Amino acid sequence: MKINKYMFLPALIALGMASCNGEGDGNVQMWEWETPEAPVEVDPYVEKGWTNVTKDYGEMPEYIRVYSSPAKLQDKDVKAFIAVADATKAKFDVLGGAEGYHTPSEFYTADAAPIIINGGFFYDGSSLSLVWRNGELVCPNVQVDSPDWSETWYYMPRGVFAKKADGSFEVGWTWTDLQDHTYWYPPPMPLENGRKPDASYPAGAKDFQAVTAIGGGPVLVKGNEIINSYEDEYLLINPTGNRPRTAIGYNSTDHKLVLFVCEGDGMTSGIAGMTLEDVANVMKDLGCDETCNLDGGGSSCMLVNGKETIKPSDGSQRSVVNGVAIK
């Protein structure tokens, strides 16, 4: 018998229907798909042993987080905190000015910024560190210092942490002449009796241009390299001793501002503080390729929504001349 190909068509259709449904009722079987798990956010600071304690301090903008340190840093028992802010969203501000005392809590009462730390150095109610606000000089880094105030005079540029017009941050050294012209130097200037910095010395000098800046020193990390410039900056702040410290840094890769404080002077049993080298190493480990030290010792303080993180080593908050706020 001659076979016609169309003779098999009904059988093939029936077989196909049966293969789609074991009962042959014409319903297509629905397969269950696994719902992919949402990606887990990796917190680089938690991975390094820090603890996210933001919720302990109340409501906070989503672009600011607060962390407490692991029990040990640099092989020392420590109590430290960092506030980390998205630099593309947060506002960096300098509080205070050339003179006048304020505790950090008084700054908070006036400003209510989520994060406040102490700022630069001061003496007798006057700032010794640069304050630069809205693109203008408020007060300079101290222009001259001396070990004897008679025969030896050091005109030393000191460290500055600055926000630039493009929104990035950088550390460097500044010096202001008697005409209030401020110069920016990429390297520090070696101490030399009577030698003044100017528009061409040290090398790479240029007019200082920034939106906002706070002075302090010494510079701890620049260009992702740890810097030892406290001698060139003539900062006699016990750099190799364990003390309370305050610093501010910038991670240019992730666009993060990192504000650091550590407790010291035995306010908590067994907690002496950290050296400048310790702080530099910690900040670099946290990803900061630019970091400047600020005033430390009894001045060191960080407020989160007005609440203290470390215990000030004076027993209570020291009155300071300026501070830094993140909003």
Summary of predicted features, one role per range:
Residues 83-84, 114-118, 160-162, 170-172, ...:
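Structural recognition of the beta-strand scaffold that forms the well-ordered cores
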Residues 126-151, 229-290, 299-327:
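Conserved, well-ordered active-site substructure
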Residues 126-231, 237-239:
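Active-site-adjacent helix-turn-beta-strand microarchitecture at beta-sheet edges
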Residues 77-82, 158, 215-217, 243-247, ...:
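Short glycine-rich loop/turn motifs
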